Structures are given as C-alpha cells and as structure tokens.
C-alpha cells in the first residue's frame, strides 16, 4: 500500500521539469475543445493496448483522445545515420516514425510492419494513419531501457544531433516536431528503474551496471538535459516511481 510509505525516508530529488506552453505559439490556432494526445515510444505503450494500458490510463485520467503509436522494442536512436534498406526496423524508431507523420506518408512503414510476425507493428501503423496532426495538442515520448540495453551510445559529444545516439535521436526528432508543429506541447517521459539481463539470464542493477556507455541513470540525466535544451517538459519515472 503506497499510502503507508513515508517518502521522507528517501533522499532523492526527481528531475521533473514542467515547462509552460508559450502562448505565442498558439496564435491563430483554433481550439476544437478537445485535448488530443499522441503517444510515441516503445514497450510502455505497446505492451498493453487494452483498457489497462498506459495510453488508455492517460486517456481516462485526462479525459483526452489518445493515439497509441508505440512500436515494440523500438528505440529513441536509429541504428544507422542514414536509412539502410538492409535494416528495415529503423523505420519503427523515433526519428523515422515522426518523419512518417511529417511527410504524411505511411506506405513504406506499412509494408515493413506487415512483414513482421508480431501483429502489433501493423496495428500501430493503422493507428498512425488515423491521426490528424492538425488536431494533436500534446505529444508524449516514452522509451524504456532499450537504448541502454542495446549499448546505444548515450550521446555523441562531437555531434549532438547524431541520430544513432540516444540523445541525438531524441534531440533531432524533438526539433523536427517543434519546427513542423510549433503549437504541439511535448512531454518526454523517462524510463522507469530497470535491470539488465545478460546472456546467462543473470540480472544486473541498471543504476550501477555500465553497459559501455554509462549506467541507466546516466541515460536518464542525458535525457533530461535534452528536454531542457529543447525547452520541453520532462517527467522523471526513474526516481519518481517506487
């Protein structure tokens, strides 16, 4: 029972950062009286698309229309800096998903999704096709520890927009969203605490295990830095959930 937990015993400060929407960015935009939220990410959204899933809970709590466009096991970073047709799964990663919306073009991602054995890929693309970006008020971006687990570089100090790095994929995509739809408010939600499973099936603490590019909470701090740099809100689920 969380009601019985004395939070004062935890010496942890969350990295939450809520940034108000600049009203000037809404100039000329007609309020349709309905809040529409687009969810982008991976397993936190794609694992449960039913009434108990994260997107459904957001819809219930906010009385909003919510589109769940999360792809299973996708990542914030891309595998290749430019699209490689030999690795079609890059289409499901954040940068390319947003490019589909920006270009209003879903032919390639639909074809690739239909080749996947997991039906959730094709189901997500069908949801994407129904989204009217002119009506979207909020975009929520949430990825779990996949980028960390895969050993994706947390960042590229020489190129902050390197889409093959965790922060570069986020930064580039957020900048693209803001330039295309300046009226959309963006929330970046961090992964929760997680443990890494090695090839032997042994679990390792994400807070202390460095996969070669930092511990999981190193990725968390880097992610919050990107949100701050881009001027968007950040929700810390790592230290903010028990």
Annotate each PLM feature.
Residues 4-22:
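Non-catalytic propeptide/linker segments at domain boundaries
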Residues 110-242:
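Alpha-helical cap/lid subdomain in secreted, periplasmic
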Residues 22-29:
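A short, basic/flexible loop-to-alpha-helix module at the beginning of a structural domain
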Residues 32-33:
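Acidic, glycine-anchored loop motifs typical of Ca2+
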Residues 36, 65, 183-185:
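Residues at the starts of beta-strands that form the adenosine-phosphate
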Residues 38-39, 44-161:
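Conserved SGNH/GDSL esterase-like catalytic core that processes O-acyl groups on lipids
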């Amino acid at each position: 029972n969380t009601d019985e937990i004395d939070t004062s015993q935890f010496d942890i400060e969350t990295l939450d950062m809520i940034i108000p929407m600049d009203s000037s960015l809404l100039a000329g935009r007609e309020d349709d009286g309905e809040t529409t939220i687009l969810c982008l990410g991976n397993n936190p959204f794609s694992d449960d698309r039913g009434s108990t899933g994260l997107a459904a809970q957001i819809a219930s709590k906010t009385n909003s229309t919510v589109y769940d466009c999360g792809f299973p096991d996708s990542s914030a970073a891309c595998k290749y800096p430019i699209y490689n047709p030999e690795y079609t799964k890059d289409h499901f990663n954040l940068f390319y998903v947003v490019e589909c919306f920006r270009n209003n073009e879903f032919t390639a991602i639909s074809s690739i999704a239909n080749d996947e054995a997991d039906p959730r890929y094709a189901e997500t693309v069908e949801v994407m096709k129904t989204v009217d970006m002119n009506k979207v008020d909020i975009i929520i971006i949430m990825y779990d520890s996949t980028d960390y687990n895969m050993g994706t570089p947390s960042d590229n100090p020489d190129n902050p927009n390197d889409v093959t790095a965790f922060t570069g994929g986020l930064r580039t995509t957020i900048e693209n969203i803001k330039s295309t739809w300046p009226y959309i408010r963006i929330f970046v939600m961090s992964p929760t605490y997680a443990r890494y499973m090695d090839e032997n099936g042994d679990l390792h603490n994400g807070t202390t295990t460095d996969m070669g590019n930092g511990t999981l909470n190193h990725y968390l701090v880097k992610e919050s830095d990107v949100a701050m740099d881009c001027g968007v809100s950040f929700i810390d689920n790592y230290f903010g959930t028990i």
